[in-house]
Amino acid sequence: MVATFCAVSAPVILNEYNAVASDSYLGGGNAAADAGGGYACDTFWGRVPGNGGDWFELVVIQDHLDLRGWKLDIYENGVLDETLDLTNHPLWSDLRAGTIITVGEDLPTDAGYNPAAGDWWIHVQAADGADGVYIEPSGFPVSSSNWQLRIRNAAGTVVFGPAGEGVSPAAGIGSDEVFRLEADPSASIAANSPDYDGGSDMSTFGAPNQWGRQNFGALRT
């Protein structure tokens, strides 16, 4: 693993990723109830096997950020598995602070992004056979096996990460959990922040995290 922790005034950060195995449910158990007798679920996917499949979520911190040509390096167990390149599409050229970006294999792209109208979410599909308009059309893993993400700008300079299990927390993300930031997103969030942890009660694909309630107000002003 490349032990680089770029975090001071990070322009974009990792907010959440799905570590739930394809044959498991969030919080364990079955379709009717989690292992504790509750109903752990995702606010978008509901309670489904795999909790939506391979996906992760970023938050834009720097206002008017240009992500054209940036690179998302994905590691499992300390080994670089895949690099997903963002394209030069104009969508990436002027992102507002507080924007949520999800990258997933299964859900088709939804780039209907309009912060002025209250739509702060961009979803792009990275999968073999996807259209490749916004991101490299290549499948990628997300798992509970020391999964980490590193973000590089168009020049190849590391601007954040790697972040994930094995950095913070050091271990303990289970195959029935998500990894999430349990703090308000800001430029002070480091890749090794102690506010990164696992959760099995709820996940929030494309929305602010809930363990308490993540507040985007300081970014979306």
Role assignments for model-derived ranges:
Residues C6-N146, R152-G198:
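Activation on beta-sandwich/Ig-like modules and their edge loops
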Residues M1-C6, G198-T221:
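A recurrent domain-boundary module in secreted/ectodomain proteins
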